[in-house]
Amino acid sequence: MILMSGQMEQYLFHRGEFRQAYEYFGAHPTRSSTIFRIWAPSAKSVAVVGDFNDWRAREEDYCHKLTNEGIWEVEIKKIKKGNLYKYQIETSWGEKILKSDPYAFYSELRPQTASIVNGKPKFRWADKRWLNNREIGYAKPINIYEVHLGSWKKKEDGTYYNYKEIAELLVEYMLEMNYTHIEIMPIIEYPFDGSWGYQGTGYYSVTSRYGTPDDFMYFVNYFHKNNLGVILDWVPGHFCKDSHGLYRFDGSACYEYEDPSLGENEWGSANFNVSRNEVRSFLLSNLYFWIKEFHIDGIRMDAVSNMLYYKDGLSENKHSVEFLQYLNQSLHEEYPDVMLIAEDSSAWPLVTKYQADGGLGFDFKWNMGWMNDTLKYMEQDPFFRKSHHGKLTFSFMYAFSENFILPLSHDEIVHGKNSILNKMPGYYEDKLAHVKNLYSYQMAHPGKKLNFMGNEFVQGLEWRYYEQLEWQLLKDNKGSQDIQKYVKALNKLYLEEEALWYDGQDGFEWIEHENINENMLIFLRKTPNMEDFIIAVFNFSGKDHEIYPLGVPLEDGEYEVILDSNEKKFGGSYQGRKRKYKSIKKSWNYREQYIEIKIAKNSAVFLKYKK
């Protein structure tokens, strides 16, 4: 039976503008049959095989070719939700290969690779209030907890929690710790656990490791009901080469470049050929799929620099640049309240500027330069830090050139790079003090915040995707307990103080940045309200200061310590009343008055002006 052609859908698909391709392609159950559609431009024939025909194509299982550009379609009776299937594709030279459905909504658990007839999930959402109030968050606190679902926490028998179970555990923990968003590492279906999801192939199929599409909808809905946002890690640049997937889908370079110099990358995966309109529709539609069907609040696009440049790292990929601009603009037209975040390690300009101004149109960009420079500085013994002072101050030179997120991500605690704790110099107690200083500096620096799971209680080991976090440290290790308490207090301070998340260029002002010998750094974070500001003071040296003078903006009133990383309750040495300082009428740091504060070695102090 030849079905209606769907000419508008085909037209948009071949133009690279089909936002709802997933509603046309893939497997779509009806009351008595299932309709299959697939794009395989170089195939001689296409059939659907599965558990319903013992994986042998019958005459009625063969597809009809709808367009010269390679859209195939068939309606098969008595196939229902839950049936396994693949496409049997005959290549141009006559070989028959089996492929999973690129548009499948659900897939078998690895190592099995069949697609599962599922249809679009019918979930009863209860997050209307959240969606109605959702916005990008330029002028709001954004404090992201980056999570790998398979290794955050496991059951006692070592198996995974499903999406529903882990949602409730994560929400309780994140609310307690004062985070605002979760960022989930990729959950498209992927064959190899060790790729962490970054080498996937089932772009429309939420990984079955942790449950069903309905389960994941429950996950997002539960977060929204508890006023927490959900950001999804998405990989639009490359995909795995496993034989059942997108690679050489119809025997030819279908989704990837034919030329290996364009199609290969450092990870051994294949780059999407976004100069091809049908590939553009596949990715454009996939972005809409996650946002429309799963109510995702933000998309973090992985490895954007791999898209912007060819393999040599020098030649610009103009097709990718144009595609990213189109992708971001299209999405913002329909979903202006969804965050688009670039993980870009290059120096490409205007990443978060409008397309009309030559920008790529992202809302935020990971500040990889800040992360690398800051960690290199913190790894130095305090005695040698004065030779590296510029690594702390340089990021302020470009802090407002883009809308930045400051990441301390999973990439920095794997492959021999050490955990955050063990990057720090000195004995254990010294390391803990350095970690608190690092986190304080991140929180005070202009930009939104992101931390990888486990950073908040300083795991000793690097992250291992196959094991849960070292939760036992919170039972028997005082250092981990102290750091977790401090991160909780720091996150709370960030949420409550607009001066820390108001990221306009007028929201920052230096007080002292040239005291290289003392390893001191002092600056203001402020709001447009002249009296609403916080002074952040950092002592990155190994020297205590009983009296340290610093210039302040206003003469009247008091300057109260609202957080001190050296407090006893956080594992420090200071125990006493909250300190308040009155200004002294004398010029200091180019200001007409100053205060004298006490600050311990390797510590941070936050002061708030009280009239």
Curated annotation (Swiss-Prot):
Top EC group: transferase
Source organism, top-level taxon: Bacteria
Gene Ontology BP annotations: glycogen biosynthetic process
Keyword terms of this UniProt record: Carbohydrate metabolism, Glycogen biosynthesis, Glycogen metabolism, Glycosyltransferase, Transferase
UniProt pathway: Glycan biosynthesis; glycogen biosynthesis
GO (cellular component) term, any one: cytoplasm
GO molecular function, one term: hydrolase activity, hydrolyzing O-glycosyl compounds
EC numbers on record: 2.4.1.18
A Pfam family reported for this protein in Swiss-Prot or TrEMBL: CBM_48
Catalysed reaction equations from the record: Transfers a segment of a (1->4)-alpha-D-glucan chain to a primary hydroxy group in a similar glucan chain
Quaternary organization: Monomer.
NCBIfam families: branching_enzym, PRK05402.1, PRK12313.1
HAMAP family, per database record: GlgB (MF_00685)
Protein task: Catalyzes the formation of the alpha-1,6-glucosidic linkages in glycogen by scission of a 1,4-alpha-linked oligosaccharide from growing alpha-1,4-glucan chains and the subsequent attachment of the oligosaccharide to the alpha-1,6 position.
Protein name: 1,4-alpha-glucan branching enzyme GlgB
Native species: Fusobacterium nucleatum subsp. nucleatum (strain ATCC 25586 / DSM 15643 / BCRC 10681 / CIP 101130 / JCM 8532 / KCTC 2640 / LMG 13131 / VPI 4355)
Taxonomic lineage from the root: Bacteria, Fusobacteriati, Fusobacteriota, Fusobacteriia, Fusobacteriales
Gene (UniProt): glgB
